[in-house]
Curated annotation (Swiss-Prot):
Record-marked site positions (Cleavage): N42, P43
Record organism: Aquareovirus G (isolate American grass carp/USA/PB01-155/-) (AQRV-G)
Recorded GO CC terms: T=13 icosahedral viral capsid; viral outer capsid
Lipidation, N-myristoyl glycine type: G2
Protein name, UniProt field: Outer capsid protein VP4
Length: 650
C-alpha cells in the first residue's frame, strides 16, 4: 500500500517504507513547558500616538483606544512564545480536520495589528522609548480571542494527548544509548492487539500517526506514491530533541544546565551565604517551616527542651475532675512524670498517637475501665513545686476517647495494647493568656481508683506527639524569645537531643532549614558521593590546612607540613557527612563540621563553583551513566526482538 499524502498532509499508518528506529541521538520532545507566565509576556507597553500637528512630545501623546480596546506591543520575546503555543496547537491539525473541529490552523498574524507610534507604560515613558514604525500590536479584544482559541483547542488536545501517550509508551520510542530497530508492521500489530478498544488511536490511526511523526524521532513515514522522491519528515522538536538526548561525553546538557540554574537561584533567594554569620540577623531572614514534627515527650529531658516540664513528687497526687457529668481521677506519679509546658508551646494542632502502647491490666485493674484522654492541668505554682492536690487549681479535658481502655485494646503476643488511637487538641496561645502555670498531659481518666494505681504511672506521654504548627508568632532559642538569630552561635552549640526536640519556631530549626537547603544544593551539583576531589571538599581542606600547619610548626620547625593526603580524606568525610545529614553541623563535638569557619568556607567555595559552573557538569559521571544506559538499550533490543517473533510482519 502506498503512503499517499492527502492535501491535509496525513500519512498512512500502513504505508510502504514506514520504519521504527529509536536512537539515543534524539529524544522525543514537544512543548510541555511553554512559559506563558507574567514576566515573559508582560510588560511590553501600550500604543501611544501624537495628537495635533505640532512637534511630537510627551505632552502630545494620547493612549490609542478604539472599539477593540487598547493596543499592547507584541515584543519579539512575546511573539516567539505565543508562536510556540500556536505551533503546538497546529501540530494536531490532522485530528482537528478529521473530527471537523476548529477552523483551520491558528495564525498569530490574524490577531495582530500593524501600527506606528510610541510604546510605554505612560506618555513620558513611551516618548523616551522612541518611535516604533510598523510594529505589531495586539488589541484587547484580539488578546481575549487568541486566548479562547488556544484554550478551546487545548481542551481537545489534552484528550488526544492522553490516547497518544498510551499508544507510544506501549511502543517505547526512546533509548538512552545506541540505536535499535523493530519491524514497523510487527510493532503495529503488537499495539493494535493490546491497545484498549476505546483508545482513539484506533479510530483515527492515520491522523495520530501523522501527529506522532512530528513528535517522536523513532517514527519515520515512508515515501509517498509520487514520481518525485520526498525527504522523510523529521519531528518539529528536533532541536530540543537533540539537546535533550544524553551524550556519552557529558551526559545531559539540559539536565546539567537545569541543575546549575536551580542551584544558583536557591543560593541567591535563600541567603545561604549567611549560614555562619557572626552578627545578629532578624528572624525574617530565615524561612520557618510549618511542617509537622513528631516527638516522644516521655523520653525528652526538660534540660533539652524548654517546652517539657517534669513533676518529681515523692507521693502520688490525685485530682478529681468532672467529664460528661461523671467524676474521674487524674493521677500524677508514681515517679517522675513529664508533661508539656503549654506556655512554651507554639500555636499548633497536637496529636498524641498512643497506638500500640502496652496496657498493664494485670498490674493495674483500674486502667481497664479508665478512659484515655489529653488534659490541661492548671497549678498555683510551677509543676516541679507541686507537692499536694491543693496545689492544682483545675483540670480541663481537651480530648478523650469514646470508650474505656479495655474496649480499645487488642492482644498482641499475650500483651494487651491500644488499638489505633489518636488524641487531638487544637492549641492557640491566647486561650491561656494570663495563666502562668498550665501543663498538658496524655493520661487516663480513672472512674474508680484503687490502690492498684499506687504503683503504676498512668501517663500516656510515651506515645508519639505530632506538633503541626498553625502560626509562628515568635522565635525562641534555649527557651528564650528572641528577635534576632546569630547563626555562628547556633552552630556546633547543640546536643543531638536538643536538635531532635526543638519546636518549629526554635532558632535551631531555622538555621537547620538553611543548612538543609545548602546541603541539597551541594548534593545536586557537587560530586561529593564520588571518589573524586570536589569544590566542597577543597573548601574544607583549605581551612584544615591552616590549622594543621600551625600545629605542625608549633615545635619550632618553620617548614614543617602536615599530611595533606589525610586532610583531604578528613575533608571528604566531613563534606559527605554534611550533604547526608546537615543538622550535624549544629551539634557539639562533630569532627571537622563543628570547627569554626568550616561551614562558611564550604558555603563560599560551593557558591563560587556553582556560579562559575558550565554545562559540562555531568562529565564526571558520563562514563558510568553511559554503561548503565547501554544495558537498558540491550534490554530494549530484546523486547523488540520478542515483538517481531510474536507478531511476525506479513
Amino acid at each position: 500500500m502506498g503512503n499517499v499524502q492527502t492535501s491535509t498532509n496525513v500519512y498512512n499508518i500502513d504505508g510502504n517504507g514506514n520504519t521504527f528506529a529509536p536512537s539515543s541521538q534524539m529524544a522525543s520532545t514537544a512543548s510541555p513547558a511553554i512559559d506563558l507566565k507574567p514576566g515573559v509576556l508582560n510588560p511590553t507597553g501600550k500604543l501611544w500616538q501624537t495628537m495635533g500637528t505640532g512637534a511630537p512630545s510627551a505632552d502630545s501623546l494620547v493612549l490609542v483606544v478604539d472599539n477593540k480596546g487598547e493596543y499592547t506591543y507584541l515584543s519579539e520575546n512575546m511573539r516567539e512564545t505565543l508562536n510556540k503555543a500556536v505551533t503546538d496547537v497546529n501540530m494536531w491539525q490532522p485530528l482537528f480536520q478529521a473530527t471537523k473541529s476548529g477552523c483551520g490552523p491558528v495564525v498569530l498574524a490574524n490577531f495582530t495589528t500593524i501600527s506606528t507610534g510610541y510604546v510605554g507604560a505612560t506618555a513620558d515613558d513611551a516618548f523616551s522609548n522612541g518611535l516604533v514604525s510598523n510594529g505589531p500590536f495586539l488589541a484587547t479584544m484580539h488578546i481575549m480571542e487568541l486566548q479562547k482559541t488556544i484554550a478551546a483547542r487545548m481542551r481537545d488536545v489534552a484528550i488526544w494527548q492522553k490516547h497518544l501517550d498510551t499508544a507510544m509508551t506501549l511502543m517505547t520510542p526512546d533509548v538512552s544509548a545506541g540505536d535499535v530497530t523493530c519491524k514497523w508492521r510487527s510493532l503495529l500489530e503488537f499495539a493494535q492487539d493490546i491497545l484498549p478498544l476505546d483508545n482513539l488511536c484506533r479510530s483515527y490511526p492515520n491522523e495520530f500517526y501523522t501527529v506522532a511523526a512530528q513528535r517522536y524521532p523513532a517514527i519515520r513515514p515512508g515515501q509517498p506514491d509520487t514520481q518525485v522522491a520526498l525527504p522523510q519528515p523529521h519531528p518539529l522538536g528536533e532541536v530540543a530533541g537533540s539537546f535533550n538526548a544524553p551524550t556519552s561525553e557529558v551526559g545531559s546538557l539540559v539536565g546539567a544546565g537545569a541543575a546549575l540554574s536551580d542551584a544558583i537561584s536557591t543560593l541567591a533567594s535563600k541567603d545561604l551565604d549567611l549560614v555562619e554569620a557572626d552578627t545578629p540577623l532578624p528572624v525574617s531572614v530565615f524561612t520557618p517551616s510549618l511542617a509537622p514534627r513528631t516527638y516522644r515527650p516521655a523520653f525528652i529531658d526538660p534540660q533539652d527542651a524548654a517546652w517539657i516540664a517534669q513533676w518529681n513528687g515523692d507521693a502520688n497526687i490525685r485530682i478529681i475532675t468532672t467529664y460528661q457529668s461523671t467524676d474521674y481521677t487524674v493521677q500524677l506519679g508514681p515517679g517522675p512524670t513529664r508533661v508539656i509546658d503549654m506556655n512554651a508551646m507554639i500555636d499548633a494542632k497536637l496529636t498524641l498517637d498512643v497506638s500500640g502502647t502496652i496496657l498493664p491490666f494485670q498490674e493495674n485493674n483500674d486502667l481497664s475501665s479508665a478512659i484515655p484522654a489529653f488534659v490541661l492541668i492548671q497549678t498555683k505554682v510551677p509543676l516541679h513545686s507541686v507537692t499536694q492536690a491543693s496545689d492544682v487549681e483545675g483540670i480541663t479535658v481537651v480530648s478523650a476517647a469514646e470508650s474505656s481502655a479495655i474496649n480499645l485494646s487488642v492482644n498482641v503476643r499475650g500483651d494487651p495494647r491500644f488499638d489505633m488511637l489518636h488524641l487531638h487538641a487544637m492549641f492557640e496561645r491566647e486561650t491561656i493568656a494570663g495563666i502562668p502555670y498550665i501543663y498538658g498531659i496524655g493520661t487516663f481518666l480513672i472512674p474508680s481508683i484503687t490502690s492498684s494505681s499506687s504503683f503504676c504511672n498512668p501517663t500516656l506521654m510515651d506515645g508519639e506527639l505530632t506538633v503541626t504548627p498553625l502560626l509562628l508568632r515568635e522565635t525562641t532559642y534555649k527557651g528564650a524569645v528572641v528577635d534576632t538569630v546569630t547563626p555562628s552561635e547556633v552552630m556546633a552549640n547543640q546536643t543531638s537531643e536538643e536538635v531532635a526536640s526543638a519546636l518549629a519556631n526554635d532558632a535551631v530549626l531555622l538555621v537547620s532549614g538553611q543548612l538543609e537547603r545548602l546541603a541539597t544544593v551541594v548534593g545536586d551539583v557537587i560530586p561529593i558521593a564520588s571518589g573524586e576531589d570536589d569544590a566542597a571538599t577543597s573548601a574544607i581542606v583549605g581551612r584544615l590546612a591552616i590549622e594543621a600547619t600551625m600545629r605542625a610548626r608549633h615545635g619550632g620547625d618553620t617548614r614543617a607540613l602536615p599530611n595533606f593526603g589525610q586532610l583531604w580524606k578528613r575533608a571528604k568525610r566531613a563534606a559527605s557527612m554534611f550533604a547526608s545529614n546537615p543538622a550535624l553541623a549544629l551539634q557539639v563535638g562533630v569532627p571537622v563540621l563543628a570547627d569554626s569557619g568550616i561551614l562558611s568556607a564550604l558555603t563560599s567555595g560551593v557558591s563560587t563553583a556553582i556560579r562559575t559552573g558550565s554545562l559540562g557538569k555531568g562529565v564526571s559521571d558520563a562514563s558510568s551513566k553511559l554503561n548503565a544506559r547501554q544495558s537498558l538499550t540491550l534490554a530494549r533490543k530484546t523486547f523488540f526482538k520478542k515483538v517481531e517473533e510474536l507478531w511476525p510482519s506479513q
